[in-house]
Design a protein with these regions (language model features):
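Contiguous segments within soluble domain cores/interaction surfaces
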Residues: 1-133
Length: 133
């Protein structure tokens, strides 16, 4: 997956769909994902140095008013100017920390996405000055 954003930009918001793989109990997965903590990390592809390390991300229903009652979730991250101040190619990952429903202080597990392919983030060079004087 490739996501592009301009240098010093804060939009567009990065969005990734959470797919159900069919290997887990759907109801349990929905309960776990509704009570999880999402974070985002991004590192430079060449140097391996983290530009963003475990900053808060959000989980939301893609379509809260779905007529069929299906729940499709998306994970989102809002970039800051500090996140995008250096042009280049970066690798991004979301981490979902799922908490045990019976004991909310215990971690049930962690899910790192994307699973099937890398998330490449291209921060494109920009000549526009973004600060308003």
């Amino acid at each position: 997956m490739i996501f592009s954003i301009r240098q010093n930009a804060t939009l567009p918001i990065l969005k990734m769909k959470v797919f159900r793989d069919g290997r887990n109990d759907f109801r349990r997965f929905e309960e776990l994902i509704e009570n999880c903590v999402a974070t985002f990390a991004m590192k430079d592809e060449k140097t391996g140095i983290y530009k963003v390390a475990n900053k808060a991300a959000n989980i939301a229903l893609e379509n809260p008013c779905d007529e069929n009652g299906y729940k499709h979730y998306i994970i989102t991250y809002q970039f800051t100017k500090d996140d995008t101040d250096k042009p280049g190619i970066f690798l991004g990952e979301f981490k979902l920390t799922l908490f045990d429903l019976a004991n909310p202080t215990q971690v049930y597990g962690e899910l790192i996405a994307p699973i099937q392919e890398e998330l490449y983030i291209h921060i494109l060079d920009s000549f526009v000055k973004t600060d308003i004087v």
